[in-house]
Amino acid sequence: MTALQGFLTPTEIVAELDKYIIGQHDAKRNVAIALRNRWRRMHADADMRKEIMPNNILLIGPTGVGKTEIARRLAKLADAPFTKVEASKFTEVGYVGRDVESMVRDLVEQAVNMVKTQKKEEVKIKVSQVVEDILLDLLIPPVKSTGMGFKTASTQSIDTNEIPDNDQELNERTRELFREKIRSGELDERKVEINVQQQGPGVGVVGGAMDEASMMNIQEMIGNMMPKKTKKRKLSIAEARKILLEEESAKLIDMDDVKDEAIRKTENMGIIFIDEIDKVASSKKGNGPDVSREGVQRDLLPIVEGSAVNTKYGTVHTDHILFIAAGAFHVSKPSDLIPELQGRFPIRVELNSLTEADFYHILKEPKNALTRQYQALLSSENVNIEFHDDALKAISEIAFELNVEVENIGARRLHTVMSHLLNELLFDVPDKIETHSTVVITKELVDQKLKGLVKNRDLSQFIL
């Protein structure tokens, strides 16, 4: 699917999201359109391309119904830089706390890491060969010429029926034998001594009137001026290979290209998910001052509208970044946001609270369903676990009942219920339960473990 990621149709995007998220079709439909519009914009006439702005989305719904998961899966589908921030963590400029521009810097950081990973993949074969040769040189140094003829620096020998012509041929054969052993992992525990670059001490800069990006640039510049120190370390070949792969990859990757591509990726494909947007909305009911709530909204406005943000990798224009905001809006309403910010989130989608039937489907259908996760965990101990259908229905009923009576935390309730149900089993494996055995979870077992707790409301508040 990698080659076609940018070309998925809205129907295909929804089908992909359906593999992981149950229900919420309106939300899936709208994010699918937003993602496809990215591709449409990139293929529009050059004159109009700059004029087409993304339609930002506001997701409204209680916790645990899939708001964050929809945004995260969308970013994976698009192979796009993605960052999640909480609006309540930001403060108005001038107050102590994170400023809103830091979300763009986080997004660029994600993009840089993505591009670096792609570039490393491109040079992987070449770098692997270089690292292999370095490790071989450490184990079997090549033959050096002396005044007395050729002498090998290695005393290693190999089993062969043929008598080598000279030391150089023996050395080559030994190296090839060791090359195969390195590739197969046979020598992973063998110790070698390598020079490792040491990280220089952190350089502190007193901010004063400087913004965060300027301070980071100065810190990086001073850090680059410091001499690079190396230290000899004795490591296993497995550990040495990891370090050498990083160092040799860095030599082949042009960081200027990485920065340029990362900024392009951020500007045209970046997705910022702003959670808890309702926490910075003023409900207008309180008499006290709303400390910096409206200020945070006003600081958010230019970022969402489109502005230039300085980062340590360069200037990023936020005009075409897709913003997805989410909030429960229990106390406040979307209309409590300042009008200018409301206007920047033209698409509003209300997500439904999860029903008992939804819980059942969540346990059974998604690729990453909780039941499959527990099966994968126990399979590592060679124990198989099976869930009867009526057991899944009983778990769903209990989770739904607890959400109604205690606190509605959405699908996260399934985690607490399943954890309590399987607690004893997870503790007993492998000491009391034999390997290659099968454990069956029945409705009777679910009732035995959970029904009593659900009936005791005071206890269920603390345990489930």
Swiss-Prot record:
Chain sites annotated for binding ATP: I22, G64, V65, G66, K67, T68, E69, D275, E340, R412
Localization annotation: Cytoplasm
Superkingdom assignment: Bacteria
Subunit structure and binding partners: A double ring-shaped homohexamer of HslV is capped on each side by a ring-shaped HslU homohexamer. The assembly of the HslU/HslV complex is dependent on binding of ATP.
Function: ATPase subunit of a proteasome-like degradation complex; this subunit has chaperone activity. The binding of ATP and its subsequent hydrolysis by HslU are essential for unfolding of protein substrates subsequently hydrolyzed by HslV. HslU recognizes the N-terminal part of its protein substrates and unfolds these before they are guided to HslV for hydrolysis.
Gene Ontology terms describing biological process: protein unfolding; proteolysis involved in protein catabolic process
GO CC annotations, alphabetized: HslUV protease complex
Annotated family: Belongs to the ClpX chaperone family. HslU subfamily.
Any one Pfam family match given in the protein's UniProt record, by short name: AAA_2
Gene3D superfamilies referenced in this protein's UniProt entry, alphabetically: 1.10.8.60, P-loop containing nucleotide triphosphate hydrolases (3.40.50.300)
Classification via InterPro entries: AAA+_ATPase, ATP-dep_Clp_protease_ClpX, ATPase_AAA_core, Clp_ATPase_C, HslU, P-loop_NTPase
Main location: cytoplasm
Residue spans crossing the bilayer: none
GO molecular function: ATP binding; ATP hydrolysis activity; peptidase activity; proteasome-activating activity
Keyword vocabulary terms for this entry: ATP-binding, Chaperone, Cytoplasm, Nucleotide-binding, Stress response
Name of the protein described by the UniProt record: ATP-dependent protease ATPase subunit HslU
